[in-house]
């Protein structure tokens, strides 16, 4: 990949992106493909959840990525940040928490060097003991980051080198802090090292970039045209100072004005505004979703009926199996076009009106 100098005809995608990088569904429709993406690999961690699946494997780790690759996923999604010394690493949170002599402390991930980042948690060298790894919940509580099967942190380069399935796509989320102002120069310093790794060792792996930060998404599109860029949005389920982040309508504008290829919305944002699915498709943009509801097979099935092209999920095993059953030829009508149950337009319209009411609670 030569930054700023790649012809659009070389753009790959969720299903070998067409020369005009628009819809995933342009090729998806040809083979009725519904894309399933593993969230942070095999699923995110929520150590305090009673559901043990959320604490089975360390998220965003090579262990998690390779475990996810055993299932019929199209992509794994993971979060990339850049350390103080310019190394792209895979980690979700803005801060890393640890404890020394009973005192909890935090450090901003982008302000530590690679060697310090790698010193937290399990160590690859069996003779070393890593620093204790803690985590801050959304409620502000600090707790031990415990999982049943742990693994060390990893870099973006290692993901390319150690994820065993070469056909498993990478959805690289460009992770930035919502509470930090980034100038264009600052964004460039953060994005270029990531793009360089992809250029050097991306090889033939299918890749898409995504970001909640509109300027980061727009800039990565300007810096390269090899890989599609998706704008992540809460779809209006949360409010931000930057109004571009506050609705699906604004997300459409960002994509169309910046030449982005698609939107990844919180699924509740789509269910609350189902009419926008057609508007997004008419704009020749791809649409995928993320969120806890995507761990519910019925919610995933409803999205398939609505024309949404894919989902990011935590419960990889359960949802890939549900999608496999959903797409079986034996579960279709005689013409092979509509999976059962086959809702009438009136029934589907009723369901789409009902869902926004249900998810308000």
UniProtKB/Swiss-Prot annotation:
Residues 1-53 form a transit peptide. SUPFAM superfamilies: PLC-like phosphodiesterases. Induction: By senescence and phosphate starvation. It catalyses: a sn-glycero-3-phosphodiester + H2O = an alcohol + sn-glycerol 3-phosphate + H(+). It comes from the Eukaryota. GO terms for biological process: cellular response to hypoxia; glycerol metabolic process; intracellular phosphate ion homeostasis; lipid metabolic process. Its main location: plastid. Disruption phenotype: No visible phenotype under normal growth conditions, but mutant plants show reduced glycerophosphodiester phosphodiesterase activity under phosphate starvation. Residues 54-323 form the GP-PDE domain. Its cofactor is Mg(2+). Keywords: Chloroplast, Glycerol metabolism, Hydrolase, Plastid, Transit peptide. GO terms for cellular component: chloroplast; plastid. It holds the Pfam family GDPD. GO terms for molecular function: glycerophosphodiester phosphodiesterase activity; magnesium ion binding. It is found in: Plastid, Chloroplast. The keyword Magnesium does not apply. InterPro entries: GDPD, GP_PDE_dom, PLC-like_Pdiesterase_TIM-brl. Expressed in roots, shoots, rosette leaves, stems, flowers and siliques. PANTHER family: GLYCEROPHOSPHOCHOLINE PHOSPHODIESTERASE GPCPD1 (PTHR22958:SF1), GLYCEROPHOSPHORYL DIESTER PHOSPHODIESTERASE (PTHR22958). Hydrolyzes glycerolphosphoglycerol, glycerophosphocholine and glycerophosphoethanolamine in vitro. May be involved in release of inorganic phosphate (Pi) from phospholipids during Pi starvation. Belongs to the glycerophosphoryl diester phosphodiesterase family. This is Glycerophosphodiester phosphodiesterase GDPD1, chloroplastic. It comes from Arabidopsis thaliana (Mouse-ear cress).
């Amino acid at each position: 990949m030569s930054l700023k100098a790649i012809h659009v005809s070389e753009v790959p995608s969720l299903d070998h992106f067409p020369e005009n990088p628009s819809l995933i569904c342009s090729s998806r429709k040809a083979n009725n493909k519904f894309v399933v993406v593993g969230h942070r690999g095999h699923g995110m961690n929520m150590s305090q959840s009673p559901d043990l699946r959320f604490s089975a494997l360390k998220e965003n780790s090579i262990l998690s990525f390779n475990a996810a690759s055993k299932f019929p996923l199209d992509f794994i999604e993971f979060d990339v940040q850049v350390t103080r010394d310019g190394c792209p690493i895979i980690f979700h949170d803005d801060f890393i928490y640890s404890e020394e002599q009973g005192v909890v402390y935090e450090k901003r991930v982008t302000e530590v060097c690679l060697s310090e980042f790698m010193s937290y948690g399990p160590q690859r060298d069996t003779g070393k003991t890593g620093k204790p790894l803690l985590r801050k919940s959304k409620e502000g509580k600090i707790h031990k980051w415990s999982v049943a099967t742990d693994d060390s942190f990893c870099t973006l380069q290692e993901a390319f080198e150690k994820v065993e399935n070469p056909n498993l796509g990478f959805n690289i989320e460009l992770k930035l802090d919502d509470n930090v102002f980034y100038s264009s120069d600052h964004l460039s310093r953060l994005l270029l090292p990531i793009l360089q790794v992809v250029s050097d060792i991306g090889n033939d792996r299918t890749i898409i970039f995504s970001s909640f930060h509109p300027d980061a998404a727009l800039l990565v599109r300007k810096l390269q045209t090899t890989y599609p860029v998706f704008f992540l949005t809460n779809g209006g389920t949360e409010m931000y100072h930057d109004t571009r982040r506050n609705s699906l309508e604004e997300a459409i504008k960002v994509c169309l004005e910046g030449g982005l290829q698609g939107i990844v919305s919180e699924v509740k944002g789509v269910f609350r505004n189902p009419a926008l699915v057609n508007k997004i498709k008419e704009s020749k943009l791809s649409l995928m979703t993320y969120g806890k509801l995507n761990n519910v097979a019925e919610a995933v099935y409803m999205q398939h009926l609505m024309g949404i092209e894919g989902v990011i999920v935590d419960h990889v095993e359960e949802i890939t199996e549900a999608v496999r059953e959903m797409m079986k030829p034996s579960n279709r009508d005689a013409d092979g076009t509509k999976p059962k149950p086959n809702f009438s337009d009136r029934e589907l319209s009723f369901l789409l009106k009902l869902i926004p009411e249900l998810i308000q609670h």
